[in-house]
Amino acid sequence: MKNIIIAFFLMLAPVGVTAQYQKTQEKAPLVNVPLENFASQQKVLFNFGWKFQLVTNENKNTDFASPTLDDSSWRTLDLPHDFQFEQPWTESGGGARGFKPMCEGWYRKSFPTDPSWKGKRVILDFGGIIYLGDVYLNGTKIASTDYGYVGLEADLTPFLSHDGENVVAVYASTGPKKGSRWYTGGGVFR
C-alpha cells in the first residue's frame, strides 16, 4: 500500500511542475531584445587614479562629497581596495569581524566627460561596495547600497557636467559593530 501511495504522488509531481511553469509564463512573458540595441554600448575602465581618505575623529565632520573639497593630500590608489584590511589587528574589533576595527572611508575621482557621452545614458557600475555605501556625483547623492555583496549601478546622466570636471565620491562603511560570520572587509572591492 505504501508503494502505491508513493507511486501515486510521483505521478502527480509533473502536473504540479507544469502548472507552476505555466503560471510563471503567464506572469512574466519573455521579451526579445535585438542585439543591435546594445551595439552602441561603450565601456570605460574606471579603476585607476582614485583618491582615498579614512574617516577619523579629526575629519568626521568634513563634507567629503563636496566637489570643491581639496583632496590633493589624499592617498592615490587603484580599485579594488579594502581599507579595513589595512587596519591594525585589535581584540576590540571582535573575532566575528576578523579582529579589525569597524571604520569608514571615502573615495573620490575627478574626470571630464567624453564629448561622445552627450545625449547618452552614463552608468557607473560597482561590483560591490562593502558593507554600506553611497555614491555622489558633483555633491549630489545618486545611489546607495546596504549590502555589499551585490552590485550597484549609479546613473550619472542627469548630474553630469559636460562643461568641466565632474567629481564622483563614494562613501563606504563596514557598518555597525555587531556580530558577523566572517571578515567582511570594507571599501570598493570589485
Language-model regions: role of each:
Residues Y21-N37, V44, Q53-V55, R97, ...:
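Accessory beta-strand-rich segments of carbohydrate-active enzymes
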Residues T18, L45, S73-D78, Q84, ...:
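Ser/Thr- (and often Asn-) enriched beta-sheet segments in non-cytosolic proteins
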Residues L77, H81-F99:
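Surface-exposed, low-complexity/disordered Ser/Thr/Gly/Pro/Asn-rich loops and linkers
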Residues N37-T56, T62, S66-H81:
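Mature N-terminal segment immediately following signal peptide/propeptide cleavage
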Residues M1-Q22:
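Bacterial Sec-dependent N-terminal signal peptides
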Residues N61, F85-P88, V135, G179:
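Generic domain-boundary/flexible-linker signal
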